């Protein structure tokens, strides 16, 4: 079962909805893309809200608005932020809003319960299934939260591939056995807290390190410069917010050289322990 929200309503002027979304996105630092039949609001690298519209045949010339979001693997923090965005639209531009929230958070906005009673058990079940698959085929590999239309990383037997890193069966199994669901959710969900804390920025960097980065000089292309810069900015922001949070310091230093940027992390920042070097 996927966790998320679907919603619908009507409006008199779809352009007002577009402007309202753009205004809210600017206030929150989200990215927005719009086209003729809809738009997408990107709240984080693995989480977005889609909206679409079609004209309603009536004398008043109204528009039907539909939308949705899938909240995994982004995490409970994303779900909360998406719910707030959807609620705000229902209070302003979209009339007669109806929604269905698979987590019931919109009906009972208790974030800690959302995380503990919905997202963590869901993650445990996904990991349990992944490990059972590896037990049946120890030489196999499981891609978890991975878009099947996306490239396939080089195979490493006995591992689980995720957007924020590769993990061995042993590493995941040990934590599942001792019930360390909070540790697992903090590591595998990109956005696990209500706001943008240090771990959120670190996980955004990890997602781009593992999934998007070519580890190429920034002057090779505009894409390399953008990706390298985003990763470095996120890691430096994370260190400013929590100097004790482990970061991928070795990868950071490598990218600083590739980006021709001076080292900006404190020397005593702890190294994030990873079984495999970042990069698919």
Stretches with model-predicted labels:
Residues 1-280:
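Acidic (Asp/Glu-rich) sequence patches and key acidic residues
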């Amino acid at each position: 079962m996927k966790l998320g929200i679907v919603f619908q309503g009507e409006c008199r002027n779809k352009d007002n909805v577009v402007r309202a979304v753009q205004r809210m996105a600017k206030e929150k630092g989200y990215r927005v893309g719009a086209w003729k039949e809809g738009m997408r609001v990107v709240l984080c690298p693995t989480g977005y809200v889609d909206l679409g519209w079609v004209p309603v045949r009536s004398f008043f010339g109204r528009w039907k608005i539909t939308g949705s979001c899938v909240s995994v693997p982004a995490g409970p923090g994303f779900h909360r932020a998406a719910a707030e965005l959807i609620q705000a639209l229902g209070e302003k531009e979209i009339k007669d809003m109806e929604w269905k929230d698979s987590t019931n958070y919109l009906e009972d906005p208790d974030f800690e319960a959302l995380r503990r009673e919905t997202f963590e058990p869901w993650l445990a079940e996904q990991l349990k299934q992944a490990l059972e698959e590896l037990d049946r085929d120890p030489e196999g590999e499981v891609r978890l939260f991975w878009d099947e239309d996306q490239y396939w990383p080089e195979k490493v037997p006995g591992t689980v591939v995720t957007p924020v890193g590769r993990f061995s069966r042993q590493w995941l199994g040990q934590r599942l056995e001792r019930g360390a669901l909070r540790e697992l959710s903090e590591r595998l969900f990109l956005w696990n807290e209500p706001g943008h804390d240090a771990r959120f920025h670190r996980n955004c960097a990890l997602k781009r390190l593992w999934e998007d980065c070519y580890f190429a000089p920034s002057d090779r292309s505009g894409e390399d410069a953008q990706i390298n810069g985003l990763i470095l900015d996120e890691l430096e922001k994370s260190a400013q917010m929590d100097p004790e949070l482990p970061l991928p310091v070795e990868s950071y230093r490598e990218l600083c050289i590739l980006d021709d940027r001076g080292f900006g992390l404190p020397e005593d920042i702890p190294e994030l322990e990873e079984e495999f070097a970042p990069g698919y």
